[in-house]
Amino acid sequence: MGNVPSAVKHCLSYQQLLREHLWIGDSVAGALDPAQTSLLTNLHCFQPDVSGFSVSLAGTVACIHWETSQLSGLPEFVKIVEVGPRDGLQNEKVIVPTDIKIEFINRLSQTGLSVIEVTSFVSSRWVPQMADHTEVMKGIHQYPGVRYPVLTPNLQGFHHAVAAGATEISVFGAASESFSKKNINCSIEESMGKFEEVVKSARHMNIPARGYVSCALGCPYEGSITPQKVTEVSKRLYGMGCYEISLGDTIGVGTPGSMKRMLESVMKEIPPGALAVHCHDTYGQALANILTALQMGINVVDSAVSGLGGCPYAKGASGNVATEDLIYMLNGLGLNTGVNLYKVMEAGDFICKAVNKTTNSKVAQASFNA
């Protein structure tokens, strides 16, 4: 739209949406705060009630919620696992102050997210950003209905996590032999032995354990990874007692085609209800890959607010799929997440300002720059 003023663009965009989708109007007004109602009124966006649609407006973000999904095979509810505080921040070169991390997590806890991965109980020699794991775990306010898992690569880390108050843990494996040696300094087989000790101890204490499989769609050292290899590692983790296996496109090279082939293989051994996907957006395929997974029966998705992240052992890998962008897509599909998009955007704005970064979320960029 060239040099058209942003306010005019805003009005034109909404008017186009009105012509194409016929929002409901007055019945929504009571659910909006005065500022949101004023914005809608000024943009002349209220229209007669049309059954089948509903609108939620947060700041400058308007999401059309379809009552019935427009695509087949999608779940009604999608659980979002927010990994920003751990996977998102671990690659930041400048150490983020502990009080900022705590405030960040507390803000995320007020968004409706039900799972927030808090930190990693790893050696500070390997991941300096996570050196304050105990202080962060003890410092956050744990909200009712929100789970706060932590990453524990070995038995020592597990015991430290439990002492700090952790009630859920995760272990981080790989489908690539080279990546396993670079990331956790041992072979896949050796890592499985360590994880078995951790998961066994966790089960003994009634602490749920989640398993990650990195490099599920490609490795920075080995290139392509066969679906069979991903299946083997996933089956081992599931068999030792991990209640959920998160399949990670660590370097973001996957496509809907490779996602489909990988999931078809893994789902022969593990039910879709025990699987999650964890997509990085290096090649801009994350949302497309997630949609493919949803259509195949997956209903758990990992993401990071503002698209935070990367990988210290995968040069050039971009951040995780942005939680804001994921929610926007899911809202548009009529899928319930229970998460407030605007509050997530606020949390993202907070952490980006704190670490002096620009958000990688397209939704946040479009909204805050409108």
Curated annotation (Swiss-Prot):
Protein name, as recorded: 3-hydroxy-3-methylglutaryl-CoA lyase, cytoplasmic
Stated role: Non-mitochondrial 3-hydroxy-3-methylglutaryl-CoA lyase that catalyzes a cation-dependent cleavage of (S)-3-hydroxy-3-methylglutaryl-CoA into acetyl-CoA and acetoacetate, a key step in ketogenesis, the products of which support energy production in nonhepatic animal tissues.
Main location: cytoplasm
Catalytic residue positions: 311
Effect of residue 86 to Q: Abolishes catalytic activity
Residues at which a divalent metal cation binds: 87, 278, 280, 320
Top EC class of this enzyme: lyase
Domain Pyruvate carboxyltransferase: 78-345
Recorded family membership: Belongs to the HMG-CoA lyase family.
Entry's Gene Ontology BP terms: ketone body biosynthetic process; L-leucine catabolic process
Keywords, in A-Z order: Cytoplasm, Endoplasmic reticulum, Lipid metabolism, Lipoprotein, Lyase, Membrane, Metal-binding, Myristate
Reactions this protein catalyses: (3S)-3-hydroxy-3-methylglutaryl-CoA = acetoacetate + acetyl-CoA
Organism (species): Homo sapiens (Human)
PANTHER family referenced in this protein's UniProt entry, alphabetically: 3-HYDROXY-3-METHYLGLUTARYL-COA LYASE, CYTOPLASMIC (PTHR42738:SF5), HYDROXYMETHYLGLUTARYL-COA LYASE (PTHR42738)
Gene: HMGCLL1
Annotated localization: Cytoplasm, Cytosol; Endoplasmic reticulum membrane
GO molecular function, one term: metal ion binding
Lipidated residues (N-myristoyl glycine): 2
Any one GO CC term of the record: endoplasmic reticulum membrane
Cofactors demanded by this protein: a divalent metal cation
